[in-house]
Amino acid sequence: MSVKDFVQKRREALIELRRDFHKYPETAWLEYRSAAKIAATLISLGYDVALGEEVLDLDSRMGLPSKDVMSAAMARAIDEGANPELVEKLGFGKTAIVATMKFSDEGPVVAFRVDMDSNDVIESKEAGHAPVKGGYRSCHDKAMHACGHDAHMAMGLGLAEYVAEHKDQFKGTLKLIFQPAEEGVRGAKAMVNAGVVDDVDYMFGLHIGFNENYANCFACSNHGFLATTKLDAVFHGYAAHAGSSPEKAKNAMLAGCTAVLNLQAIARHGKGASRMNVGIFESGTGHNVTPDTAVLKLETRGATTEINDYVIGRAETIIKAAAEMHDCSYEITKQGETPSCRMSDELAPEIQSIIKPLGIFRDVPLDYSGGGSEDCAYFLNRVISRGGMGTYMLVGSAIKAPHHNPLFDIDEEDMLNGVIALGTIAAHYLK
């Protein structure tokens, strides 16, 4: 059966699968229901499934929620139908899966990476929003699949099922990597440091959506990702009565303000693009209380890891100086990071040559420019550094609102075309 015929046969099931993931979104490191459902499906298809600390270097995880939050998420997942044994094995902040299928003949190791986490977004309740009309709007407070990872999981399982049904046609080894905590670039490093792609010859990542210019397109590569680092900076001062004893205070809010203004003024870098953004600033408890704590949540980006490191260095200097100016102490905690990445240029024309004849996409450009960051870079860099090849592809979709917006939604036809594309790529490199 061709991959097109397979997707047509499984069309309704794949759409229902995506909608199920959409209804039960789980944010970074809390993907217990999603991961348990995926693992159970992969086991039933005959894959060798490793999960949890089998596929994670625990010391490399970043931005973990508290144990109380994780415990509540585990209990919720079980209440919502997750296999309790699998949830227990996933444990505290170990929601990662690698499924492997080895075929009878020797051949290359081909890997696809799929991200699972949702966003910290409250989904729209507007009547015209398709998940509202269809009854699959998020049922979890302050969590929404607003970046298409629900579709990614459905595509990954669609690929898994297609390959399992046709395993006699392939040679080599297929690895399906289901990664937690892509949002905030927190999860990939721990999987890479556990060695999950050290034997991989071809590494593929993929994203759905992007913008209207790429609707119903398939881009074969990316110009490259920006390196990025996510930091939390906390200033500690001393509270005092703002009217009767202001001289006794150490104003943490002023330290934070000084830092914010100067962080945004960091000089750009001559070797390429650089970014600085303070996304959250929290401080103060009352009108007449001098703030003793200020919290900044910020991110840096750079066209290369070198440029990003420059921005980080300047940021750390500014935060330290702002604290000293206002007689405060401070601490900086890294919550996530990913390096820059370049793709294997020779892969894009080859992928274009096998996707274009399918006739299901309006256009199949060699590459696209996203300007963002993605921790799939860890997987790609490791494979390429060890002599393999890798690329990150785009399934363009006519999204209803920008990524990370409460009204975000994809065209499910594009998701189905994505399964066809992934199956075609897998078949090409596993033959």
Regions found by a protein language model. Name each.
Residues 63, 97, 119-121, 127-144, ...:
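Histidine/acidic-residue-rich, glycine-tolerant segments that coordinate divalent metal ions
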Residues 86-91, 182, 221-225, 367-371:
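Short Gly/Pro-enriched turn/cap motifs at secondary-structure boundaries
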Residues 21, 42, 112, 149, ...:
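Divalent metal-coordination and catalytic microenvironments
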Residues 109-112, 227-234, 292, 389-395:
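Short coil-to-beta-strand
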Residues 2-145, 158, 169-170:
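Acidic/His- and Gly-rich active-site-bordering loop/insert found
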Residues 44, 253-431:
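Metal-dependent amide/peptide-bond hydrolase catalytic core
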